[in-house]
């Protein structure tokens, strides 16, 4: 059962690709390179955060219909893809759509899907398992902005160094989480053994 926590925790970790702290790293370099106002860039996070409120019921429906594994896999796939495509954006509308996708995934399907599958697998140790999910998120919240800034600084002489940083984020999301979700996660513990973990 703890391997399920590892898979779920990986999604909680990588969802920080679309965290507010992560986009904050990009505000200055993107505004300087693209000529956009900082308010415009930050606004993408705020707008998507509002939209995610209405997406949550849909996320719950998808998880109930298709299971947490499929929902989490495609959420991580989209999160990585949207990050990669942001690296190629020159248009505010395109940026809003792409970052909005990532932000909605951050706020809704990953959080709900990870909590749902852990609840199915654990009874007595559910609190500990859920706590590990929270820890995974907290670690990602600290590391993603740090790594994003490091990549920008490594190519600091280039005005569009932020683009390479988004590529790094997208690839990192895929490499860390997709294999774990695909190969280790099982929605129903009864598919493997008759009793859930304690």
Per-region residue spans from a language model:
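Residue-level signature of mid-helix packing/kink "hotspots" within the transmembrane helices
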Residues: 49-57, 141-142
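Symmetry-related core transmembrane helices of the 12-TM Major Facilitator Superfamily/SLC fold
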Residues: 164-183
């Amino acid at each position: 059962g703890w391997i399920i926590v590892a898979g779920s925790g990986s999604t909680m970790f990588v969802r920080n690709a679309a965290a507010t702290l992560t986009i904050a790293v990009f505000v200055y370099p993107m505004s300087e390179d693209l000529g956009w106002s900082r308010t415009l860039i930050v606004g993408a996070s705020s707008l998507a955060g509002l939209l995610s409120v209405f997406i949550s019921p849909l996320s719950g429906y998808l998880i109930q219909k298709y299971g947490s594994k499929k929902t989490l896999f495609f959420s991580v796939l989209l999160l990585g893809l949207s990050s990669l495509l942001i690296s190629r954006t020159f248009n505010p509308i395109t940026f809003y759509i792409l970052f909005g996708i990532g932000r909605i995934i951050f706020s809704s399907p990953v959080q709900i899907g990870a909590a749902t599958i852990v609840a199915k697998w654990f009874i007595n140790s559910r609190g500990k398992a859920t706590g590990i999910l929270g820890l995974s998120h907290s670690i990602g919240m600290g590391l993603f902005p740090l790594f994003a800034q490091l990549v920008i600084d490594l190519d600091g002489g280039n005005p569009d160094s932020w683009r390479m940083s988004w590529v790094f984020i997208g690839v990192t999301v895929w490499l860390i989480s997709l294999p774990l979700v695909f190969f280790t996660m099982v929605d129903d513990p009864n598919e493997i053994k008759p009793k859930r973990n304690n």
